[in-house]
From Swiss-Prot:
Homotetramer; dimer of dimers. Pathway: Amino-acid biosynthesis; L-lysine biosynthesis via DAP pathway; (S)-tetrahydrodipicolinate from L-aspartate: step 3/4. The gene is dapA. This is 4-hydroxy-tetrahydrodipicolinate synthase. Pyruvate binds at residues 57, 215. It comes from Leptospira interrogans serogroup Icterohaemorrhagiae serovar Lai (strain 56601). GO terms for cellular component: cytosol. Its main location: cytoplasm. InterPro entries: Aldolase_TIM, DapA, DapA-like, Schiff_base-form_aldolases_AS, Schiff_base-form_aldolases_CS. GO terms for molecular function: 4-hydroxy-tetrahydrodipicolinate synthase activity. Catalyzes the condensation of (S)-aspartate-beta-semialdehyde [(S)-ASA] and pyruvate to 4-hydroxy-tetrahydrodipicolinate (HTPA). Belongs to the DapA family.
Amino acid sequence: MIAKSGSNQESNPMFQGVYTAIITPFKNDKIDYDSYFKLLEKQIKAGVSGVVPCGTTGESPTLSHSEHAELIRETVKAVQGKIQVVAGTGSNSTKEAIELTEAACKDGVDGILSVNPYYNKPTQEGLFQHFKSIAEHSTVPVMLYNIPGRTSVNLLPETVLRLSEVKQIRSMKEATGDLGQMGKLISLVGNKMTVLSGDDNLTLPLLAIGGVGVVSVISNLFPKALVQLVESFQQGKISEAKKIHYDFIEVFALAFMETNPIPIKAAMCWFGHCGPEIRLPLTPLSQNETSSKFKKVLEGLKEKGYE
């Protein structure tokens, strides 16, 4: 379910449901748009709320600026308004993030995803000013993205509370893995912003404490299953949501046996959705007992009828 502007987490939120952090297929070191458009169609048919191109899972750090801009434009054209496009436009340079955001807005995205600045390790005040500046240059709603495991900085709930007063800041992808922090965040800003899980394995626990969805990696391969999990919970069918969660719990872990998106890219290749290419410094998934187990577990889920 997708809502229009002027909403909040308690009623009719702007961002809720399943947003797929979509992979970027490559062929001969160029974006493989034939495969990519088929992936988008798979997501639309599954009923996801939206896709997130140019994010971590989409290998944004190794996309050139022209590829980044083109991929967002092509995504908007391809989905034709059937689902939302929330474009990754983050950077550790505030100026660059603003430029990427302004370009994405002009190309017709529904929202932008802005990650914590990485490497330069700003203070909480620096984070506040960074995101405030980006939001002030955005014509669409902004989803903050807190992932300290990759950025080395943690966007604290108190800082998010300050940011919730900024007009375009409407949502947050929370990938700390800390349910305590997530609960505090929702208690502080839940009437102003939506909070979505940035970890597939915490989707159900976060829903239980007031979250409204997930920005998912696994939904690249199993979009319908993740939609069913979230919708079952929202409809009060808790047993059904729990069953899906536990059926996928091993995959949720194995999908991160190596750095994301290495495992999901391999999985998508195994099932014929893209080629095996991944850009350096990332390398193809190691062929070992764990990766063999990953493939076997995925095949088992397919045999159970999950899509």
